[in-house]
Amino acid sequence: VPEIYEGTIEIKSVARDPGSRAKICVHSQDSSIDPVGACVGMRGSRVQTIVNELHGEKIDIIKWTEDLPTLISESLSPAEIQKVLIDQDNKRIDIILTEENLSKAIGRRGQNVRLASKLTNYEIDILTDKEDSERRQAEFKDRTETLIKNLEVDETLGQLLVSEGFVSIDEIAQAEPENISKIDAIDEETAQELISR
């Protein structure tokens, strides 16, 4: 591809399963150039030359972007992603999608998700929307039970605190009384008592 050789188009990332499939992220500083179109060529002529050179290895060419959710969605194509949850600290991404898109996102023997993971340098977990809902319900229940046990509050108050974003004992201990008392059914005195526990 002449544009790559000339430096007009830059290869940002490559992930390969040699002999089977490759994913390549390309980018151009020149907004008038479509990096994917330039690499694919007229009716696929440019990419087909490379595919033939690699003895039939399939090549997915993806437009690189700094927007990680978009890059992940593109790299897991043709699956349609509902939600992307990113944990920058642990370099992990949770992908939420429908049951119908699960096999597309994972690919044969996990190839699609494995290559997307290599391409982005993030560990990727794929969950159906049902699994995500069950996980969030379990987390909510665990957090509520922790508050009930450690703060000696009833279930309603525990659920209320968790639903308002106070998900740990430390968060409550470090909170200002006026932030907790903004919650319906909690006055300043109760808030102060919760913080002191």
Describe each model-derived feature in a short phrase.
Residues 1-197:
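RNA-contacting regions in translation and RNA-metabolism proteins
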